[in-house]
Amino acid sequence: IDLIDVEDAKRGACLRAGFAASRGSQIIAMNADEWFAPQSLSKMVDIACDTAADIVFPTVSLDRYDAHRERHSRVLDAASIAIEDKSSMVTGLPQLILDGLVVQTSGVMYGRPLFEACLSHGKAYRTVEFMTYALLQAQRVSGCGDACFHAVAPKLTDVFDPTMYARVSDETRALDELADSLSEADSGGRLKLASQKFYFAGLVACIENLCLSPHGVSSIERSARMRDMLEAPRTRQMVAALKDNHRGLGLLFGPIASAKPARCVMCTHLAAFLNRTGAKTA
């Protein structure tokens, strides 16, 4: 194992420098504050060798710490991932998308030729576009449920992020392109449906970031940003696709579907209160 530590302020420079210095047949890239549980790397290598997989996903633990330094984790289980052809890709990818593993590029093990192909194709690491391109090029994809990769959970309400919605739109566009490329094998439209639900989850996160983070944005600007997101063509497309299949999507689907900014704000605060008190919403 080569452990290569590179620091460079220029975007993408660390990744390319690290890859150029590496010698291994498998590549994993990660941040300094991310870590693997003991024996995880060897288990992932075993899976890669046993299955000839081009991509191996670990189980991901998204960790946050409270004021008492107690860890609270959301676990994305990779045990069920097994993709060997287009048919199994159409079956396996929707769960990969809905579970959130498709955005977890960090900590994933790639075969060296595949990783190099993604870099040479100009795909930016830590983007869904990088992952979807890799998935399309891969012959086999496996999950290693016994390997655990720890990463910091995203903090949606700490700081207002004005670029968040654009990022969600780009990620969904990459998933739409992936679904289009597999449309012949996906006669039931499962990938398209997963992409719509992915966009909905991202939109809800954007609304939470806008409404709950301390940002100093005026109520007028907040309403304008909210209306732009609710009236976006991609949002209306998602609402039409999920109107008969929105069970379990939570309090915000109704206000989003009716494009009511004030109701979205109210339901966002209500959902945050219910989450804090441990109440369940349908």
Predicted region positions:
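Glycine-rich, basic loop-to-helix element that forms the pyrophosphate-binding segment
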Residues: 6-22
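Donor-binding/catalytic cores of nucleotide-activated saccharide
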Residues: 11, 34-144, 152-164
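Active-site acidic Asp-centered loop
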Residues: 30-32
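Catalytic core of nucleotide-sugar-dependent glycosyltransferases
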Residues: 146-155, 160-187, 205, 209-236
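Short aromatic/hydrophobic "clamp" motif used to bind/position activated sugar donors
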Residues: 27
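Amphipathic alpha-helical protein-interaction segments enriched in hydrophobic
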Residues: 189-208
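Acidic donor-binding segment of Leloir-type glycosyltransferases
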Residues: 1-5
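Membrane-interface aromatic/basic loop that binds lipid-linked glycans or pyrophosphate carriers
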Residues: 34, 52-53, 212-282
